[in-house]
UniProtKB/Swiss-Prot annotation:
It is an enzyme of class 3 (hydrolase). GO terms for cellular component: cytosol. Coiled coil: none annotated. PANTHER family: POLYNUCLEOTIDYL TRANSFERASE, RIBONUCLEASE H-LIKE SUPERFAMILY PROTEIN. It comes from Nitratidesulfovibrio vulgaris (strain ATCC 29579 / DSM 644 / CCUG 34227 / NCIMB 8303 / VKM B-1760 / Hildenborough). Its main location: cytoplasm. One of its GO terms (molecular function) is nuclease activity. It is found in: Cytoplasm. This is Putative pre-16S rRNA nuclease. The lineage of its organism: Bacteria, Pseudomonadati, Thermodesulfobacteriota, Desulfovibrionia, Desulfovibrionales. Belongs to the YqgF nuclease family. It comes from the Bacteria. GO terms for biological process: rRNA 5'-end processing. Could be a nuclease involved in processing of the 5'-end of pre-16S rRNA.
Amino acid sequence: MKFLGIDYGQRRTGIAVTDAGGRMAFPRRTIAMTTRDAFFVELLGMVEVECPDAFVVGLPRLPGGEETLTTRQVRNFVERLKRRTTLPVYFMPEELSSFEAEDDLRDAGLRGRRLEAVVDQQAAVRILESFLAVPEERRSLA
């Protein structure tokens, strides 16, 4: 199966995809949040190009598992996404994926705008890699 990973954010959303066999994840793009409609037009356009079988959306929580405002925003986004597509949506618990991705990219020498342009994509890659490591029977549909 091919998955499209999403690191949803209020300002920017990182997108990554797996290969057709669902074994490796690759960064694709960052979608800037201008308006909700424009955002979904761009996201669904990527779905037409990439042809994924399902979405994997990072679900941020505090280290103790408590939900936050950001968690609720992601859940609301997923509900809007499910109204626009018939593809299944999986949640992948994530803690600090964006911070870890930023650290890795800084270590690789990226700074400023170059870093900002790809950090959300790299966070989406991390979300997909974590998801792919989970046995299928333990994956959680949204």
